[in-house]
Amino acid sequence: MFREHIGWIKECHDLGLKVNVWTVNSLEDMQWCIDRGVDYITTDEPERLQELLRSQRSFHDVTGFLPVYGKLRDCKNPLYSRLSSDMQPTVRKALWNLSQNTAGLYVRFRTNSTSVGARWTVKYNNQFNHITATAVKGLDLYCLQDGKWQFVNSAIPTGKENHVTIVKNMLPQEREFMLYLPLYDGIDKLEIGIDPGAEIVASELNSPDRENPIVMYGTSILQGASAS
């Protein structure tokens, strides 16, 4: 019941009120409360809650921390737009609207964390009958192995606000990662989650090579989502 209305916790905090949620016994509900800053969680499973609290990741907002690649040109305004704001008056409205979908945009980072998670808020929360939610507004994580980018896993969305563990139980060593953003939706906020005490920095490798970009233009047949 308490998960039906997302905004009520923020409204309470804005009024200076503390939030206590009672009888939270499932791990999913516990995580939901933690993600939204519930002040007090009352549960019949205190050991499970303590274990979950110990396993929480340290989240890092991409804004001002990691570059966003895959744009027409390097621009920071808006951060998750494929076109810069100075182009908005000169392009068709339909084209500008499509540019707010983050298709082809990605961030790269290096970390020694044994797990990688993500918290992200999509712009529109689009839903289609013929395409899975993962294809519409999910994330795809790749890792650089022996000079090649290997697919790791997808972050499956649940709605407008999402919190997903993408990969865990890796050996504690430094790795290069690339995270692709949603295809048919935009991003309002994106945070990368790593182990407490682990390090995360922007990648210094020029991979994929951005010196001579190839621009591909076409229908859904080109990108494969709705080819039929």
Predicted regions and their residues:
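N-terminal secretory targeting modules
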Residues: 54-213
